Every structure is written in structure tokens, then in C-alpha cells.
Amino acid sequence: KQVLYLLPEIALTVQIMERLHRVFGDRLGIYHSKYSDAERVEIWQKQLSDHPYDVILGARSAVFLPFKNLGLVIIDEEHETSFKQQDPAPRYHARSAAIVLAKMYGAKTLLGTATPSMESYYNAQQGKYGLVELKTRYKGVQLPEIQVVDVKDLRHRKMMSGPFSPQLLAAVREALKNGQQAILFQNRRGFAPMVECKVCGWVPKCKNCDVSLTLHKSINLLTCHYCGYTYPVPTECPNCGSTEIMGRGFGTEKIEDQIAEIFPEAKIARMDLDTTRTRNAYERLIADFSEGRTNLLIGTQMVSKGLDFDKVSVVGILNADSMLNYPDFRAYEHAFMMMAQVSGRAGRKGKRGLVILQTKNPTLPVIGQVVHNDYEGLYQGILEERRTFHYPPFFHLINVFVKHKYDKVCEQASHELCKTLRSWFGGRVLGPDKPAVARVKTMNIRKIVIKLENGIDQQKVREYLKFAQQQMGKDPRYGALQIYYDVDPL
């Protein structure tokens, strides 16, 4: 029988591929989006031949490959949001698709993670899934020691060196001195997340999108992370004429610059979307760090995704608060997962690792839950909130997005659509509202949320939504209007 092994991140396939290749050799096929079309067609045709691969290792798109006799589906790091395809359509979740695929073939499904998603853990608690808990780490290595550092207090006492606390610098210095490695985690790429006039507070924004621009020092340009448009860095403020234009905040590029000044002897690598655009760049970064050619890795959430490096003894989480301050009901859950996963990179083999967690709010419950690895506490606390406010795992969410070039048309159409939806779904419909980023690539956006209790007739819901979309399409005022749905959004 065949096995499908799904991973959330292409970077992970490199590490696991080497391990599986040692066992399965030519029986192993790899499939992900960094491969060329020709390479992917080749794998597809091999799957249709009389001698398909026995094991397919891949990112989310591998779930659509043809199989002859599928016996097992493994979804590693099942909590990862990367399994959800956002744009463009189809907006599917590879975990859900894989579970359906396994059902079609009568195959077994295995979900693996140290920090389960609320939905999966709830299903396990309800007896819908089986639950197996591994109480000890591989080879009995202890979980890392997590040291919480109050950066607000240190800033007040003028003891911070940029974004680095003295505790973090001391730990990194010690690790490098002993021939160990360190990882610094900052979930913002670029040099400075924002540029601002020091005199009047003017902030340059993208002309196509409703977002401020990020400074990328390596190319000396301001970049929009939504449409990719670049702008020259202004030398003077168009608002007040001041030449004091400053970068605000810390992106991975700036962290890299500053840490290189503090540790000039360190061999530093940076892992984010900008440094891993090609397949080779990914593989080279991981190989260099695995083999010790680099000893200090700075990265965004990519570094949290199940990578396994023997010599990492210190992990620094530079700004825990940035993960919590999102207008999203899953912010706490995601922050816990991200911090727990990043922490798990420390002390993989042999001795116990150390994690320095920098925050302005050390008393937040989620910080304590990360320190004590208390997933159960987090789960129970969040579950009650979700039940009260009608969120997953008790309700399904559908986000309805309305887009148009003109804001007025977008506003009007979204209100009309909302009225139609309310006639069917009543108080389950919320909105329309402007999302956090209300304009992307010159298109204005409105968002409507539908909350549906579990067990509702999905076929009927689908028919209603299709009908609503067709009705709007018939209206001559809304010829260029775009409407699309995101079911179970993340």
C-alpha cells in the first residue's frame, strides 16, 4: 500500500527527505510548489503508471496527487496554518482534504503535533479521533528551560541593547563560545516594519493597498508586502519637509545587522520569505546550519516549523507581544503554538536547552502556559470562550469577501448581500465590516462573517450562497464586483 506524508513547510521536506531516503530509496517521491511544472508532471505521470511511488512526501498540494492503493496518510505538524490555502482559490485546508482522501481509500490517518489545533484536540476529546500522547521527548531529553524577561522594566532601566536583553546576549555568547548554535525568532521580515517622520509622524503608505510600507535595507527600497510594489526611500517628508525620516520597529534584516555588530565572529544566516525564494536557497540555508557552517540563525515563523538541529542550545523569542496583538479570535492559540514550537528547537539532542522569552507583559496567562508547557490549561480556558461566543470547534465560520475598485460600490453591494444573507441565516450573519487591510491591489474589500452551528445542512448553505452570488451578478450595477467565500478560515 502507499503512504502520503504531508508537511506544512517546504523547508521541512528537505530534512525529512534525507531521513526517509535512507530507508526507502527510489520508492520515495517528493512533491511541492518549488518544483518546476515539468518535474511535477513527471511525478503525476509516475503516480498513474504501473509502478507508482510507495511513499509521497510533500507540502499541501500533494493531497491532490493520484493514488492506486493508499493505506496511510500522515499529517505532520497538523496545527500549522500553512496547510490552509488562502489565495488564490481553491481555499482548501490540506488536513481536511487529506482526512476525506483517506476515507475514500479506507486508509488510516495519523495527525502529529506537540501543540494540537483546538478543533483536532476537541475531536480527540469527543472520541471522534483516537488520542495517543507521548509524555517524554526523544531519548528522554528534558524540555527546555524557559526564562521570561520583562523588557519594559529593562527599557525603563536603560539596560536593553536595541531589541536584545542582557540575558539573551549572555546566553548567545555562552552558546557560541561552547561551539553550540542559537536561533533568534522575530515574526517580521524586512529591516524596519514601518518608516515614520520624526517631526510630524507621517508614514508612507502603498498607493495600491491600505498598508504602511516596510523598509528593506538590502535593496534600499520600501516594499508593500501585499502587492509587492516598491518605492524609493524618501529623503524628506512630503507633509512637513523634515529630513528626519526614521525606521520604526525591528524586522529580521535589522536584527541580523545589529547582532552582527555585537557578535562579529558569529556566522549568521537569515531565514525568511526574502532569503528563501528558490528551492536551492532553502536547502542551502538548512544544510549550512545543520552542518555547522553557520551558528546563529535569525528567522520568522519558518524557523518554528519542526526543524531538527542537534547543536541548538539557545532560542531567543524577541517580541512575544507582537503575536498576541492581532484582531483575531485565534491570536492566543496561535501565539502559544508559535512560542511552544520555537522553544522546541532548543536542546533537541543531549543537554537541556534554554529559551529566552522577551515580553512587555510577563503576567499574561499565555506566557505562563508556554513556560509550563500547559496546553491543557490553554485548551480549557479558550474552549469556554469559544462556546460562549459561537466560534470553532462549536460553530463553523464562513467569511464572505466583497471586492470592487470603487469603495462606494463595494459598501453598497456588501450591505445588499448582507440583507439577502440575513433573510436566510438571521442573526448568524455579522457585518459587513472593513477588514484590517481594507484595500489590496487597488481593490476595496468588505467582509461578512456567517457563524453556523455544527450539524447544519451544508448542502443547503452551499445552495443559498451560490444563489446569493448569482443574484448579485445579474445586477448591472455590480458587473465588476467580486464575491468569494472562505469556509473555516484561519
Ranges and model annotations:
Residues 424-435, 477-486:
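Short beta-strand elements
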Residues 438-440, 458-459:
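Short active-site-adjacent structural elements
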Residues 419, 427, 490:
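Conserved beta/loop motifs at nucleotide-recognition and modification sites
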Residues 1-54, 58-411, 419, 423, ...:
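Inter-lobe coupling/hinge segments of SF2-like helicase ATPases
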Residues 436-439, 473-474:
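Short proline/glycine-enriched turn/loop segments at secondary-structure junctions
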Residues 85, 470-473, 489-490:
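Short, Lys/Arg-enriched, disordered terminal segments
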Residues 439-451, 486-490:
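Short, low-order "capping/linker" segments at domain edges
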Residues 413-419, 459-470:
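Short amphipathic alpha-helices in soluble, non-transmembrane regions
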